[in-house]
Design a protein with these regions (language model features):
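Domain-level signal for soluble alpha/beta catalytic cores
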Residues: 1-167, 171-219
Length: 219
């Protein structure tokens, strides 16, 4: 990851959000189906896999450990531990082989105080969402300010800048056509002004629109 590197594609299909079949697989404890989503994404060219098994109907703390273990036993791809459950995050990081991506922290003090100690302890790379107690800023200025705060607080915990990747937040253009420009300006300034690396949930841009693959690719 860096200025000279090609974009890193993180597969997002191991996630129940908006996926009825996957959510049912979690409820049914259908590990084979969950793993199949990882295999299909590897075949499609993903460089890493997001892993989110959070659902009210399951024990996320136990399930994320099982899924991470199974995926690592079968696939060579790095995994992104995606959870807002701090206990699940720590359990997954404790048994993870290698340096995990951690999704995520944000500019809220409470969240940084909970997540940064785990990043430092287990040596991962954390995704920093450019939002804080005031929500998501409508301007690049606001988002860059949050990114700067995240970097500064990470440094307080002894976490190097290269181990923090900022998500400039990609919003759907169907709700706000100008939001794409704000996102692009945010990531440009994070690179130019803060010297940081960035990540985006690119598919968010097309939510609720037809021809989503075309819109995602163009963006």
């Amino acid at each position: 990851i860096g200025d000279e590197a090609q974009p890193l594609i993180i597969g997002e299909r191991i996630n129940p959000t908006g996926k009825k079949r996957f959510k049912q697989a979690l409820i049914d404890h259908d590990i084979d189906y969950i793993i199949s989503q990882g295999l299909e994404q590897e075949k499609a060219g993903a460089h890493a896999l997001d892993v989110n098994v959070g659902s009210p109907e399951v024990d996320e703390v136990e399930l994320i450990q099982e899924v991470v273990g199974k995926l690592q036993s079968i696939l060579p791809l790095p995994l992104q531990i995606d959870t807002s459950n701090v206990e699940a995050m720590e359990k997954a990081l404790r048994m993870y082989n290698g340096k995990a991506l951690i999704n995520s922290v944000n500019g809220k003090e409470e969240t940084m105080e909970a997540v940064f100690p785990l990043v430092k302890k287990y040596g991962g790379v954390v995704i920093g969402l450019a939002l804080d107690e005031d929500g998501i800023a409508d301007t690049a200025d606001g988002r860059v300010a949050v990114a700067r705060k995240i970097y500064e607080r990470a440094a307080d915990y002894g976490i190097a800048k290269e181990n923090v990747i900022i998500d400039g937040l990609c919003m759907t253009v169907s709700a706000d056509p100008e939001s794409a420009l704000v996102t692009l300006e945010t990531i440009r300034r994070i690179h130019d002004e803060l010297g940081g690396n960035t990540i985006l949930g690119v598919s968010n841009i097309s939510f609720g629109l037809p021809a989503r693959e075309l819109i995602n690719s163009y963006f």
